[in-house]
Amino acid sequence: YKIISGYRRTKIYLSYLITCIIEGLMCLFTYMFIILIFGLFFLEPSSLSTIEILKISIEVILLTISFTSLFTLLAVLFADKTLTVVISTIIVFGLSVLSFLMLEHLKEPEYINQNVISDNGPVLEITKNPKYLTGTKRKVYEVTNDILPSSIAWRISDLSVIDRNNVMYYMIIFTLICNLIGISILNKKQLR
């Protein structure tokens, strides 16, 4: 960050954030335009309603803003740009793997069909799934899964494997938390 005399650090942080958000959204819209053109000519029409497509588009825009907020926070934490890029890549990869694993655990059914051999031959029996998460562990997985942008990205790509009703609120909360932390760190940071 370059501190310009006469400007508060909060304004500098927010201007950097807004610039990054605009750049991220420009990349997103370019990508969406290319996919739209490609899809019109080479893919079948979508089975989703217009409302669902608009909702997913808004979620993807908020997802871009959430990741941009996270990357801006990381840029404040580390002065070295190369280190920031490496750490950002590792964090995004780690969050993606963590989110994927959490979603897989949350998708487990509560009951499963199990073949049991009896005197009359094989019988199909419904039993409780030992992999199904319950209690506090399930709540922790659900809350973490709802807040992390990488989990939201997995859910959007799966087209609503798990309920996405509150996704927009969680992304706004995540964005606000990242920005508040980033602003407070920049305000306390000793600069040369």
Predicted regions and their residues:
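Membrane-helix interface residues
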Residues: Y7, F78-A79, K189
